Amino acid sequence: MISLKAQYGLKAMVSLAAHYGKGPLQAKDIASSQDVPVRYLELLLSQLRRARLVDATRGKKGGYYLAKKPNTITVYDIVTAFEGSILFSQNGRNESDNFAFVWKNAEKLLVKHFRAMKISDLIPKLR
């Protein structure tokens, strides 16, 4: 349903949220705390930068930081940065299918849930 890439991206974003206001975090530190290979995490962070959720500074004290306040970034923002959208109804299913309403309703519920959940709400889950 939700890719491993999006799951790791969410974990990285929550790590950055927990560090918000304390300066940038280096990719290696995020990677070790989330048990993700550094090179893979850097690819994810670059995708989050393109989505304007993360920014970075170069140099010895450089690293990554949130581009917005943690209480304004939703799980939906992060998942769609990786997935593009959350669609159950078009996963090879015909819209005229008698059960298309099931997938549409599931999609609406998940989108509503992800939009309501801020990454700041997930910080306690890191510990």
Regions found by a protein language model. Name each.
Residues 2-10, 14-36, 65:
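N-terminal helix-turn-helix DNA-binding core of bacterial DNA-binding proteins
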Residues 70-94:
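Conserved segment of winged-helix/HTH DNA-binding domains
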Residues 39:
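Key DNA-contact positions within bacterial/archaeal DNA-binding proteins
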Residues 16, 44-49:
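Basic amphipathic alpha-helical segments that dock to polyanions
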Residues 91-127:
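C-terminal regulatory/oligomerization modules of transcriptional regulators
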Residues 32, 49-50:
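Alpha-helical residues within the helix-turn-helix
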Residues 53-66:
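Beta-hairpin "wing" of winged helix-turn-helix
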